[in-house]
Amino acid sequence: MSHTEYDKERQITNTKLFRDYIEKYLEHHPMVNNQLDIIITTSQQNEYGLTTRIYFFIKEKSWKKYEMIQSEIIDNILASATIFELNIFQRD
């Protein structure tokens, strides 16, 4: 069975694996403050797909560095979606 198929016995989907990946990535990222909450949520599916929200805190306080680190992390997460055969879509 491929990772994109639903495993009925263990209830694992590619979206669950993606959320788990994001959480582990953030937990081990040196600039993420893992002493504070890391939360990844997915809302109910609608005509646009699934909305995934990612909440985490960065150790850096300098605004410019903060923005650079956050952008790097989000870029990595977006690029990794294809590994899980997920497509990223942003609605205006």
Indicate where each model-derived feature is located.
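Structured, soluble regulatory/oligomerization domains located on the cytosolic or IMS-facing side
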Residues: M1-D92
